[in-house]
Structures are given as C-alpha cells and as structure tokens.
C-alpha cells in the first residue's frame, strides 16, 4: 500500500514540475499563476485584425447559376467571372475577413463586402492570371510595372463581369 502512495506522490510531484510558474508580472502582463506546459493564456481584450487598413466596400452580385465561395486571401479582382462588381475598385485587394474563412455568394444574391489591400510586397501571381505582378500604389518597387489597365482589359476579354 505504501508503494502505491509513494507512486501517487511521485506522479503528483512530476505533474507539478511540468507546470511553469510565471512569477511576477511580465512584459506580456501576466501575473503570478501556474500554467501547464502547452497551456493557453488568453488576453483580457479581444484581438482585432486589419484595424489600420483602409476598407473599400464593393457591392457584389452572383449572376451565375451556382453558389460561389471566395476565400479570405484570394485576390478579389480575379474572383469568379460570374460575380459582377466594380473590379477596378477591387484591384490589389482581398476580403476583410478572418484568415481561413470565406464568403459564399448564392445565385442571384447581391451583397456588399469589405475589401482591404494586400500587405507585404503586394506582388500577386496565379489566381486567374489576370495580374501576375505588383498591385500596390505609389513608387514601383524592383522595376515591376503595375499594369492595372492591362489587367482590367484582360478580365473583360476573358469574360469576367464588372459593374463599371
């Protein structure tokens, strides 16, 4: 019986040794608390994302006969050709929604969506290959030429609908 008690005591000590004591208040604002390894420390205030980015609102209508989903980091300018919206206003922008989420557009539905500029180098390749280059504004980096008008022409030529 005493072996079992010692075993339990040893297990308890082992568990306690896995806990990390944060000690006094740290730069992250944590006070004295025992947090197990891999434990989560939640902030007192909600996390906000994209709070200082300019938002462009665009009215979108699905003219197709099937639902269309557009993901959070898809270049909205190059979204499905059956979506009708001001594509020029969406150039270089993505949906202002949480990462890994999407917005679904049902056939015939019209809705307004918030868009924000891409961060980083603002160089976009792939999607529907309408742009394949820099989409930012201002000084052109690394000799990349922004060709917004060419991308708009390509979109119209390939049957991408636009409200303007």
UniProtKB/Swiss-Prot annotation:
A UniProt-annotated Pfam family: Urease_beta
Keyword Transferase applies: no
Its EC number(s): 3.5.1.5
A biological process term (GO) from this entry: urea catabolic process
Any one GO MF annotation of this record: urease activity
Chain segments carrying region Disordered: 1-30
Superkingdom to which the source organism belongs: Bacteria
Keywords: Cytoplasm, Hydrolase, Virulence
Catalytic function, reaction form: urea + 2 H2O + H(+) = hydrogencarbonate + 2 NH4(+)
Subcellular location: Cytoplasm
Primary location class: cytoplasm
Pathway assigned to this chain's UniProt record: Nitrogen metabolism; urea degradation; CO(2) and NH(3) from urea (urease route): step 1/1
InterPro entries on file: Urease_beta-like, Urease_betasu_sf, Urease_subunit
Composition bias type Polar residues, residue spans: 1-10, 20-30
Matches recorded under CDD domains: Urease_beta
Subunit structure: Heterotrimer of UreA (gamma), UreB (beta) and UreC (alpha) subunits. Three heterotrimers associate to form the active enzyme.
Function: Expression of the urease operon increases the likelihood of bacterial survival by contributing to acid resistance in vitro and in vivo in BALB/c mice. Y.enterocolitica enters the body via an oral path and must survive the acidic stomach before being able to colonize the intestinal mucosa.
Family: Belongs to the urease beta subunit family.
Name used for this protein in its record: Urease subunit beta
UniProt organism field: Yersinia enterocolitica
Gene of this entry: ureB
């Amino acid at each position: 019986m005493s072996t079992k008690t010692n075993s339990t005591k040893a297990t308890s000590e082992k568990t306690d040794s896995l806990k990390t004591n944060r000690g006094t208040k740290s730069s992250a604002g944590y006070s004295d608390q025992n947090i197990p390894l891999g434990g989560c420390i939640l902030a007192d205030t909600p996390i906000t994302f994209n709070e200082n980015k300019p938002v462009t609102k665009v009215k979108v209508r699905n003219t197709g006969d099937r639902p269309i989903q557009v993901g959070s980091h898809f270049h909205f300018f190059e979204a499905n050709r059956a979506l009708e919206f001001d594509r020029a206003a969406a150039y270089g922008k993505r949906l202002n929604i949480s990462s890994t989420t999407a917005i679904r557009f049902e056939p015939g539905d019209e809705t307004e969506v918030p868009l924000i500029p891409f961060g980083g180098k603002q160089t976009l390749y792939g999607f529907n290959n309408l742009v394949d280059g820099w989409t930012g504004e201002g000084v052109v980096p690394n000799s990349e030429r922004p060709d917004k008008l060419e991308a708009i022409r390509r979109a119209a030529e390939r049957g991408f609908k636009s409200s303007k």
